[in-house]
Swiss-Prot record:
Localization of this protein: Cell inner membrane
Xref: Pfam families: ATP-synt_DE, ATP-synt_DE_N
Membrane protein topology class: Peripheral membrane protein
Name of this protein: ATP synthase epsilon chain
Function: Produces ATP from ADP in the presence of a proton gradient across the membrane.
Entry keyword set: ATP synthesis, Cell inner membrane, Cell membrane, CF(1), Hydrogen ion transport, Ion transport, Membrane, Transport
SUBUNIT field: F-type ATPases have 2 components, CF(1) - the catalytic core - and CF(0) - the membrane proton channel. CF(1) has five subunits: alpha(3), beta(3), gamma(1), delta(1), epsilon(1). CF(0) has three main subunits: a, b and c.
Database matches in HAMAP family: ATP_synth_epsil_bac (MF_00530)
GO MF annotation terms: ATP binding; proton-transporting ATP synthase activity, rotational mechanism
Family: Belongs to the ATPase epsilon chain family.
Major localisation: membrane
Lineage: Bacteria, Pseudomonadati, Pseudomonadota, Betaproteobacteria, Burkholderiales
Coiled coil: none
Length: 138
């Protein structure tokens, strides 16, 4: 099976680079599946788990906190606001962040405070979902 080059980068650093058979990630309008030869595309991505099926049939998971995706026929670049490899995700921190966001939503002050709390809640929930997905694949 032919492969596609996958680069996952955050605003701080390169997170992951590999030859892969398949990539799945949360696009703005739904889940995207990418194989070599995919139609070129640039789109936003939502917070969630990027699943990379490597050329050696091993899988790698990376949590992204949103960002952009560029697809070329032989290359995929994920430019994430924040990216964390699956094995580096901290469940306790995500649970605590979700709890703080829930409390902030209940004790909201301004509309801005509510929007920020909702955003933090969505991010923590996406991290917990990514952790659950990562555990199922172990």
């Amino acid at each position: 099976m032919s492969t596609i080059r996958v680069d996952v980068v955050s605003t701080e650093q390169s997170i992951f680079s590999v030859e892969a058979k398949f990539v799945a990630l949360p696009g703005e309008s739904g889940e995207l599946g990418i194989l070599r030869g995919h139609t070129p595309l640039i789109t936003r991505i939502r917070p969630g788990s990027v699943r990379i099926e490597k050329a050696d049939d091993d899988e790698e998971f990376v949590f992204v906190a949103g960002g952009y995706l560029e697809i070329q026929s032989d290359h995929v670049t994920v430019l994430a606001d924040t990216a964390i490899r699956g094995h580096d995700l901290d469940e306790a921190k995500a649970i605590e962040a979700k709890k703080r966001a829930e409390e902030a939503m209940q004790n909201r002050g301004t509309d801005f405070d509510l929007a920020l709390a909702q955003s933090e809640f969505a991010m923590a929930a996406a991290q917990l979902a990514a952790i659950a997905r990562f555990r199922r694949k172990k």
